[in-house]
Regions:
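Short solvent-exposed loop/turn micro-motifs enriched in small/polar/acidic residues
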Residues: 12-13, 34-36, 67-68, 77-78
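A short glycine-rich, His/Asp/Glu-containing loop-to-beta-strand
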Residues: 1-32
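Glycine- and acidic-residue-biased ligand/ion/polar-headgroup-sensing regions
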Residues: 37-56
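A generic "binding-loop/recognition-motif" signal
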Residues: 24-26, 34-37, 81, 90
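Short acidic-glycine-tyrosine-enriched beta hairpin
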Residues: 41, 55-80
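His/acidic/aromatic-lined binding-pocket segments of jelly-roll/cupin-type domains
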Residues: 19-20, 39-44, 75, 85
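Short beta-strand His + acidic residue motifs that chelate non-heme Fe in jelly-roll/DSBH
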Residues: 30, 51-53, 75-77, 83-88, ...
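Double-stranded beta-helix
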Residues: 59-60, 82-136
Length: 136
């Protein structure tokens, strides 16, 4: 349901730039980028997706619907902010920029109040819960 194409040549490049092609049902577990601190920018090139911002206990504090058709193209997430994304339209493609070098998310940066990606049923239910919070 998801495929990346990296523009950066090496994972330790100072800036990571990639296309992230995703389909509805893709689970992007809520996370943050601390230690190392990294800001992240999403620019939606096609399709539709929602970015969610969470507080420390998992309450949604903001949702941003990205849709070129509606004139909303991107979102910037500051280092340390809990965030996640739900894909709302087939064929969605996001251009993502984040400081390098690439660092896999540590357990401390995965939201403890969200289901693990390996628990598909719980992840699917969580996606539906987030979708239900959006104003249609």
């Amino acid at each position: 349901l998801r495929m990346n194409y990296n523009f950066h040549e090496e994972l330790d490049d100072p800036v990571n730039r990639l296309l992230n092609a995703m389909e509805p049902g893709t689970y992007l577990r809520p996370h943050r980028h601390l230690n190392p601190d990294k800001d992240e920018v999403f620019i939606l090139l096609r399709g539709k997706a929602a970015v969610f911002i969470f507080d420390e206990v998992g309450n949604v504090t903001e949702s941003i619907i990205l849709s070129p058709a509606e004139g909303m193209y991107g979102a910037e997430i500051k280092a340390g902010v809990w965030h996640g994304m739900v894909v709302l339209e087939s064929g969605s493609v996001i251009y993502e920029v984040k400081q390098g070098p690439f660092a896999p998310l540590s357990a401390d940066n995965l939201a403890p109040w969200s289901p693990a990606a390996e628990d598909k049923d719980a992840a699917d239910a969580y996606i539906k819960k987030l979708e239900s919070l959006l104003i249609k």
